[in-house]
Regions:
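P-loop NTP-binding core
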Residues: 1-93
């Protein structure tokens, strides 16, 4: 499954939903890649804090990727993970 969590407005919970969905799917035994497409990098930061605390299971994360690089990364990784979850940044806060 490839899932994008997005909204044009910032602060509506996109990152919270993306991170929690990634962790929930990982707890179900799925191999997950969370792509942090927001320049703020909050998804990556949340997963880093979780990993530093020793929380399992771990979730792979790719940092702030957008545009053609995002498309290329998804194409490259879609066969390596059960799910790819993309947290895209808001444009209108």
């Amino acid at each position: 499954m490839i899932l994008t969590v997005g909204n044009t407005k910032g602060g509506v919970g996109k990152t919270t939903l993306a991170v929690n969905l990634a962790v929930a799917r990982a707890l179900q035994g799925k191999e997950i890649l969370l792509i942090d497409g927001d320049r703020q990098g909050n998804s990556q930061m949340a997963l880093s804090i979780r990993a530093e605390g020793g929380r399992q299971p771990g979730v792979a994360c790719a940092a702030a990727v957008e545009g053609p690089a995002l498309r290329s990364l998804v194409q490259q990784m879609k066969g390596k993970f059960d799910d790819i979850i993309i947290d895209v940044g808001g444009r209108d806060s």
